[in-house]
Amino acid sequence: MAGKGEGPAIGIDLGTTYSCVGVWQHDRVEIIANDQGNRTTPSYVGFTDTERLIGDAAKNQVALNPINTVFDAKRLIGRRFSDASVQEDMKLWPFKVIPGPGDKPMIVVTYKGEEKEFAAEEISSMVLTKMKEIAEAFLGSTVKNAVVTVPAYFNDSQRQATKDAGVISGLNVMRIINEPTAAAIAYGLDKKATSAGEKNVLIFDLGGGTFDVSLLTIEEGIFEVKATAGDTHLGGEDFDNRMVNHFVHEFKRKHKKDITGNPRALRRLRTACERAKRTLSSTAQTTIEIDSLYEGVDFYSTITRARFEELNMDLFRKCMEPVEKCLRDAKMDKSTVHDVVLVGGSTRIPKVQQVAMTNFFNGKELCKSINPDEAVAYGAAVQAAILSGEGNEKVQDLLLLDVTPLSLGLETAGGVMTVLIPRNTTIPTKKEQVFSTYSDNQPGVLIQVFEGERRARTRDNNLLGKFELSVIPPAPRVVPQITVCFDIDANGILNVSAEDKTTGQKNKITITNDKGRLSKEEIEKMVQEAEKYKAEDEELKKKVEAKNSLENYAYNMRNTVKDEKIGSKLSSDDKKKIEDAVDQAISWLESNQLAEVDEFEDKMKELEGICNPIIAKMYQGAGGDAGVPMDDDAPPSGGSSAGPKIEEVD
């Protein structure tokens, strides 16, 4: 592969259900299509007896192999097994999830006949690797650097885990950026030609599994996030689930059979529901038709748009809570919002547009000029160009001012949360505060770092990590001075340090030792595993190519001999020699489908050794090309390299 050492930096939208990749090229963003010609790729990984499939190939076989096809890794990443949302999701997933060390959820599949356990980070890293390969195929060079997006409302552990997934996939994640902020860049560049002055823009991002709302002020290339809100567990999949449950009950009512115990039937129903949901965005009614859904029973039904809306009405209304919270936090009235930008496939649902905008924003026109599926990857690609210094002046002048979505603080006496960094503070940021001891001659203090909005009690918030500052000299309470510093970097990841001013004793923690966080050693091991899987995939590809070459050569040779123009020029002995060799090769192929590469190659050499000299002799006998009409299937003349050649069709 030709190309510069490291190739350009790419932007990846790592989605719950679909992912998308873009790159800055020729002064614009190019959203890159995969090998199937699709500009978005399913975030699915399938494991079979022989291979690992990622993307479209994995999703296409999901009904045949539901328990070993993993999706929704984004709903697991950075969460604990005991999380209520994880427990709810597990009821709907066909694959198995078990608790690992530190309450970390582990996905269990059977791969090549062995039971394997994967962390959500590993599954996400496989999807990232696929997106990286899609970009490399397009660019013709290796790609090392990427900007990866996360929901704005992702907490610290979810961001860290996403960064780890990037490391496992072999990418250098230059920056983690928020999805609505990335979409705002796409909107800003799209609108730049037409607008002047300050604009307040609300990004409404409803995807397959997550929901974000961000309010930004855009002026002269400065994108300042004023507030952000959301729900990391609300999206298109939840609408699908409602429809699946609706039809499960209908099937039970009509046929007195319960399909919930059958993963394959449920998967086929879910696929049909996903398709129906999309159809209902443009028509008022659609049908579901599934042959032999369960125990030989065909299932035919219809659903109207009104019924679909009724099934999901509470969820659609739920979308408005973060919008109101976002406006409150930004201290803005909805009348001051200039543009509402819809992002994410689920915003195509007419009722979402109506509830969200027409009702709430009093019939305001929605901005639909940017592609809801691609806007996030577009913005990530622009940010990647900025960070690697590749874009033109149009993008190099952009400045992104993002915010932290949740308040950060520590626990003080009585289990109270003392906030150092309130939510919606622009990042990067650094905040210091002086604390002291609670009792006389206290030998040390325990610093417990929390994120969340419950000021009264830390136990209702999320504990990010804790550390001790010990060896404080004996002193009356409130005398020692302990400076605590919270420092958030541009990825939204937190460092906390504490220092005893009298002794100079220091201690610090990067909030990465979250209970479920992977250790450095585990990440290293996963990187090696990922390389091993990649090598196995390559090996399989070579095997398939070698097998196909032999098969193509054998069948071509058979057709060549059958062709009267050529067959008539061969002696019956030679003809029989070729036919026997070809028959023997084809029957060997049928019983050795899983042979090794060198076995296929040896067989190929053996077959060529018999056929090529005979064909070459025939051509020479015919005086070069005289009198032998060349046929498409006819092999070219020449020494041992003669014989039909086949070109791989991409």
Swiss-Prot record:
SUPFAM superfamilies for the chain: Actin-like ATPase domain, Heat shock protein 70kD (HSP70), C-terminal subdomain, Heat shock protein 70kD (HSP70), peptide-binding domain
GO cellular component terms attached to this protein's record: cytoplasm
UniProt keywords, alphabetically: ATP-binding, Nucleotide-binding, Stress response
Pfam families on file: HSP70
GO MF term set: ATP binding; ATP hydrolysis activity; ATP-dependent protein folding chaperone; heat shock protein binding; protein folding chaperone
CDD domains: ASKHA_NBD_HSP70_HSPA1 (cd10233)
Spans annotated as Disordered: 621-650
Any single GO BP term: chaperone cofactor-dependent protein refolding
Family statement: Belongs to the heat shock protein 70 family.
NCBIfam families: PRK00290.1 (NF001413)
Protein name, UniProt field: Heat shock cognate 70 kDa protein 1
Organism: Solanum lycopersicum
Taxonomic lineage of the native organism: Eukaryota, Viridiplantae, Streptophyta, Embryophyta, Tracheophyta
